[in-house]
């Protein structure tokens, strides 16, 4: 933590700068009413007008039309849901899968209390938090990669 030096108001150079208005926030243009009352509404209304104009002028559909009677064989979620999908896919009891998903944020909330005595920001001086981060990242990557594979190879990633 750095030590901030208090300004010496008896210094003639500083007094001259302050007399000219330097060192204060009196430069530029005030945010009220110029920005907040005039510029921001113009930008917001212009953005809305552009979106409405594009929707009216080009009402094309995005992607293929949905067919509820023809579903794909393997439905995969978005990539950021792969670890959660893998947990739900491999655990036989769905209640246990939901409890495992709830335990992840609950476990992350306990990490600051495990090392609350340690005030360092260097990760090498906080071994518990660093270990939890590295193991959690490895498990999330393992589960995420496994979710893209068939169920028989998903836990071992086809390595074993």
From Swiss-Prot:
Annotated signal sequence is: none
PROSITE patterns in the cross-refs: CYTB_CTER (PS51003)
Question: One GO MF term, please?
Answer: electron transporter, transferring electrons within cytochrome b6/f complex of photosystem II activity
Where in the cell does this protein reside? Plastid, Chloroplast thylakoid membrane
GO CC annotations, alphabetized: chloroplast thylakoid membrane
Question: Topology relative to the membrane, per the entry?
Answer: Multi-pass membrane protein
Give the UniProt family note: Belongs to the cytochrome b family. PetD subfamily.
According to UniProt, the name of this protein is Cytochrome b6-f complex subunit 4
* Source organism: Lactuca sativa (Garden lettuce)
Taxonomic lineage from the root:
Eukaryota, Viridiplantae, Streptophyta, Embryophyta, Tracheophyta
């Amino acid at each position: 933590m750095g030590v901030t030096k208090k300004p010496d108001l008896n210094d003639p150079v500083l007094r001259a700068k302050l007399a000219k208005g330097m060192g204060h926030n009196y430069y530029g243009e005030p945010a009220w009413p110029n920005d907040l009352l005039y510029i921001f509404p113009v930008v917001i209304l212009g953005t809305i007008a552009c979106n409405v104009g594009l929707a009216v002028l080009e009402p094309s559909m995005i992607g293929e039309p949905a067919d509820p009677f023809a579903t794909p064989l393997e439905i995969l979620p978005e990539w950021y849901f792969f670890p959660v999908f893998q947990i739900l896919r491999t655990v036989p009891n769905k209640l246990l899968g939901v409890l495992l998903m709830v335990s992840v944020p609950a476990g992350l909330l306990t990490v600051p209390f495990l090392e609350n005595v340690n005030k360092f920001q260097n990760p090498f001086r906080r071994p518990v938090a660093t270990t939890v981060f590295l193991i959690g990242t490895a498990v999330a990557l393992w589960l995420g990669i496994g979710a893209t594979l068939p169920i028989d190879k998903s836990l071992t990633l086809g390595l074993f």
